């Protein structure tokens, strides 16, 4: 089974994906590294630009039929069996991205993307099997246990559990300040 771990930058994708792969005894695949290795990604400043169709081709050709956890904020656009969309409180995302040295504009873009469910909506448009997991106030180990429990119980779709509209008024001034 190919499992995509996706979400807005700062939700904990890499940590959760590595732990989940280890727990399930699956291969861990960083989409950035995979794209660079296959020649369908290139470094531009601090980021990797990816040709999505080419990356999907290589995923299909080299990983289909294998057990792997794909880590990356584009993983929900790949040919996978299950998409896990990780979510986190927008302010928490802003704090994490500030700690990583993101500039104000990038922080604002990502906090807003989380606030309006951007990645979740894309995942639902691309796939039937989508599970949404709120990582706020949970350890990575607890998030992995929740994912494994959902997989083992046969749940293939669970969306709509996160609603940031309740914190919208609190987040808008935060966005104007660039996450400060």
UniProtKB/Swiss-Prot annotation:
Its EC number is 2.7.4.3. It catalyses: AMP + ATP = 2 ADP; ATP + H2O = ADP + phosphate + H(+). Residues 99-109 are annotated as: LID. This is Putative adenylate kinase. It holds the Pfam family AAA_18. PANTHER family: ADENYLATE KINASE ISOENZYME 6 (PTHR12595:SF0), POS9-ACTIVATING FACTOR FAP7-RELATED (PTHR12595). The keyword Transmembrane does not apply. It comes from the Archaea. Belongs to the adenylate kinase family. AK6 subfamily. GO terms for molecular function: adenylate kinase activity; ATP binding; ATP hydrolysis activity. ATP binds at residues 10, 12-15, 100, 138. InterPro entries: Adenyl_kinase_AK6, P-loop_NTPase. GO terms for biological process: ribosomal small subunit biogenesis; rRNA processing. Keywords: ATP-binding, Kinase, Nucleotide-binding, Ribosome biogenesis, rRNA processing, Transferase. It is an enzyme of class 2 (transferase). SUPFAM superfamilies: P-loop containing nucleoside triphosphate hydrolases (SSF52540).
């Amino acid at each position: 089974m190919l499992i995509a771990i996706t979400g807005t930058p700062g939700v904990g994708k890499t940590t959760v994906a590595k732990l989940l792969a280890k727990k399930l005894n699956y291969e861990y695949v960083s989409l950035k590294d995979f794209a660079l290795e296959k020649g369908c990604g290139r470094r531009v400043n601090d980021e990797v630009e990816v040709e999505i169709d080419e990356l999907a081709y290589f995923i299909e050709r080299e990983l289909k039929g294998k057990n792997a956890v794909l880590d990356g904020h584009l993983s929900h656009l790949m040919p996978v069996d299950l998409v896990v969309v990780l979510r986190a409180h927008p302010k928490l995302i802003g704090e994490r991205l500030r700690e990583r040295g993101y500039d104000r504009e990038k922080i604002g873009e990502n906090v807003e993307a989380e606030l309006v469910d951007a990645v979740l909506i894309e995942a639902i448009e691309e796939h039937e099997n989508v599970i949404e997991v709120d990582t706020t106030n949970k350890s990575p180990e607890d998030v992995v246990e929740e994912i494994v429990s959902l997989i083992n119980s046969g749940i293939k779709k669970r969306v709509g559990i996160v609603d940031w509209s309740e914190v919208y008024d609190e987040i808008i001034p935060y966005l104007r300040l660039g996450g400060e």
